[in-house]
Amino acid sequence: MTSPFDSKISGPARDPFAQGRPASIFIGRKASARRAVDPDVRALLREYLEDLHNGTGTRLLEELGLCQGDVRVDVAVVNGELSGYEIKSPSDTLARFPNQCRIYSKVVDRAWLVAPEKALEKSVAPEWWGMIAVFEVGDRLALRVLRPAQLNPKRDPISIAKLLWRDEALEVLRGAGRARGVMTKSRKVIWKRLIESVALDDLRAAVRAALKRRPEMIDLCQRR
């Protein structure tokens, strides 16, 4: 099958996560309107992520709710880490981004802002956030990785626990031998028991495993 990036202009490194290497330009489909909107950028980003992670056991989820739906991740990538991509198309503003950034920063291992370069320059994203510029090459949209994402230096255990559905959280507690006394309790009580009983790295791994098991996940290993 032809790659969506057969028309890409490549630098020496194909891996955008490799630091200190020139970023590649990934050219995608034509925009659906005179001015690119969210669906155009989202489609290009998905093509890029599918091409990057195909065959690696990675799964992709759109509109992943964080902190019980306070914020939704435009595109989440689940593998050995949980990465979140926030999209701002040329027709968007950054008005909501400070709150989105705050919530993302409680949960994800790596975060990316995908936006036109002018918006990236104005953003309040922390230094550990990665930045991907959206721009036009002729009549097509393209992406360039300007700054690789670093590991989130400070995640909030309770916000991570809230990614688990009630039955998923109880399963983790049963595995840790700590479910007794909370089986019929509220999610708030269950989440509290989780963060008291399970190490953060183990909790993160349990969340990733749960997300991979959910039926709405898109299995990138099976796409081609």
Give residue spans per PLM region.
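Non-catalytic C-terminal interaction segments of nucleic acid-processing enzymes
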Residues: E50-D51, G130-R224
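Interdomain/boundary linker segments immediately adjacent to catalytic/signaling cores
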Residues: T2-A36, M217-R224
